[in-house]
């Protein structure tokens, strides 16, 4: 049993619990697995990104100094985990081998939904600003915001990827 929250791995062949990984503050948000079975996730109510291996053992934990509520990750083919932050309005890129921050960009509003990587290698993130007006922002994955980046305004997209 996970008293405070955490991550549970389930055997997909029979539905039994394989392992658990407890967290200290809250639920595991938006777990994403790489080709080796390593799992990366954020934790509700914390500033920590976790990486665990396919057996449920810790690889690394990284305090990114920003609130990660509602933030999920996108894993690039070059081994970067992109996540959005609620505080400080940033998208961060973490090296999946060690958790070091290798990309950091301020997007101007709270990131309130998982970051996605499109087939065009752009990052897409849902943000929310004043009066709960949401936006979707897109920018190139070239370590800086591209001049041809764009943004679209919509409704309240807190915790979702929906567009009104």
List where the protein language model places each region.
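Extracytoplasmic/lumenal domain signature
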Residues: 1-164
């Amino acid at each position: 049993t996970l008293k405070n929250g955490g991550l549970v791995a389930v055997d997909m062949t029979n539905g039994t619990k394989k392992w658990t990984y407890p967290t200290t503050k809250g639920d595991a948000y938006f777990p994403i697995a790489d080709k080796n079975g390593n799992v990366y996730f954020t934790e509700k109510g914390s500033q920590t990104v976790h990486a665990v291996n396919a057996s449920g053992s810790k690889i690394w934990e990284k305090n990114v100094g920003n609130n990660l509520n509602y933030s999920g990750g996108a894993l690039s083919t070059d081994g970067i985990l992109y996540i959005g932050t609620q505080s400080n309005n940033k998208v961060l890129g973490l090296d999946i081998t060690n958790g070091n921050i290798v990309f950091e960009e301020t997007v101007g509003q709270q990131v309130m939904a998982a970051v996605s990587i499109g087939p065009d290698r752009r990052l897409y993130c849902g943000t929310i600003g004043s009066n709960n007006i949401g936006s979707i922002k897109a920018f190139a994955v070239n370590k800086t915001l591209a001049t041809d980046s764009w943004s679209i305004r919509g409704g309240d997209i807190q915790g979702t990827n929906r567009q009104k």
